[in-house]
């Protein structure tokens, strides 16, 4: 959520609501030769991943990642109804961008089934994205860790506007808790209590919690 720029005394300024513990990373610089790498090894890798119907969600979650993942999912769903493998390794990021990817996974899954594969760490907004997959199609690699916690936001401005944004964050927290309760089978009360602080889980603990269906050790185990 963004507010307009202007005099700090009368304009509320809010950072996007986050689901992580990390500060915003600097945006990558756009170089003139970025569009001239069609034959580069990176482009070849992206092409092969696309042909194999694999999507990587690695790093912080922001609007650029959301746009890229949305485009890939829609393009893949438009070419075939075969399964799409989505790999998630993320510390989290902006809730709104996570919401976009979460909803798009649900949207595309009605056309082409999506396998969610957790690896590394699946934290915060990354866990929100991961939870978009069907329960039976949520898997992870053996050493994956998962983190659930409440959203955070920053705002400054008139006290009335700060109060409004604080209430919105509470609503967001309640909405996210409902999502995780539904997707894990836990009660809303338990999820609310667990996410009041950083709630870490190993792969096996995430299975017991209901977030992960099973651990896989090879690509041949994907359906």
UniProtKB/Swiss-Prot annotation:
Chain segments annotated as coiled-coil in the UniProt record: none
Location within or outside the cell: Cytoplasm
GO cellular component terms listed in the entry, alphabetical order: cytoplasm; endopeptidase Clp complex
Record field: compositional bias (Acidic residues): 21-32
Location of the region described as Disordered in the Swiss-Prot/TrEMBL record: 1-40
Catalytic residues (positions): 124 (nucleophile), 149
GO biological-process terms attached to the record: protein quality control for misfolded or incompletely synthesized proteins
Enzymatic reactions: Hydrolysis of proteins to small peptides in the presence of ATP and magnesium. alpha-casein is the usual test substrate. In the absence of ATP, only oligopeptides shorter than five residues are hydrolyzed (such as succinyl-Leu-Tyr-|-NHMec, and Leu-Tyr-Leu-|-Tyr-Trp, in which cleavage of the -Tyr-|-Leu- and -Tyr-|-Trp bonds also occurs)
EC number, UniProt record: 3.4.21.92
GO molecular function: ATP-dependent peptidase activity; ATPase binding; serine-type endopeptidase activity
Pfam families (UniProt xref): CLP_protease
Keywords for the protein's UniProt record, in alphabetical order: Cytoplasm, Hydrolase, Protease, Serine protease
InterPro entries cross-referenced by the UniProt entry: ClpP (IPR001907), ClpP/crotonase-like_dom_sf (IPR029045), ClpP/TepA (IPR023562), ClpP_His_AS (IPR033135)
Assembly description: Fourteen ClpP subunits assemble into 2 heptameric rings which stack back to back to give a disk-like structure with a central cavity, resembling the structure of eukaryotic proteasomes.
Entry similarity comment: Belongs to the peptidase S14 family.
HAMAP family the UniProt entry points to: ClpP (MF_00444)
Purpose: Cleaves peptides in various proteins in a process that requires ATP hydrolysis. Has a chymotrypsin-like activity. Plays a major role in the degradation of misfolded proteins.
Annotated protein name in UniProt: ATP-dependent Clp protease proteolytic subunit 2
Source organism (scientific name): Gluconobacter oxydans (strain 621H)
Classification lineage: Bacteria, Pseudomonadati, Pseudomonadota, Alphaproteobacteria, Acetobacterales
């Amino acid at each position: 959520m963004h507010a307009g720029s202007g005099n700090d005394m009368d304009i509320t300024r809010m950072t996007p609501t986050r689901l992580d513990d990390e500060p915003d990373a600097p945006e990558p610089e756009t170089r003139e030769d970025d569009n001239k790498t069609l034959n580069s090894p990176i482009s070849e890798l992206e092409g092969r991943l696309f042909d194999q119907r694999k999507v990587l969600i690695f790093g912080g979650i922001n609007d650029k990642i959301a746009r890229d993942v949305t485009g890939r999912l829609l393009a893949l769903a438009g070419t075939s109804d075969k399964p799409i493998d989505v790999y998630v390794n993320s510390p989290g990021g902006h809730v709104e961008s996570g919401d976009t990817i979460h909803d798009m996974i649900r949207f595309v899954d009605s056309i082409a089934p999506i396998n969610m594969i957790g690896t590394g760490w699946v934290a915060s907004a990354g866990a929100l994205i991961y939870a978009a997959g069907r329960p039976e199609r949520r898997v992870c690699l053996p050493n994956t860790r998962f983190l659930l916690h409440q959203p955070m936001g920053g705002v400054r401005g008139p006290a009335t506007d700060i109060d409004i944004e604080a209430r919105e964050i509470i609503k967001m927290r309640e909405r996210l808790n409902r999502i995780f309760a539904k997707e894990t089978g836990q009660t809303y009360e338990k999820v609310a209590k667990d996410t009041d602080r950083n709630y870490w889980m190993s792969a096996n603990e995430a299975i017991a919690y209901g977030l992960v269906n099973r651990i896989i050790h090879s690509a041949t185990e994907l359906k």
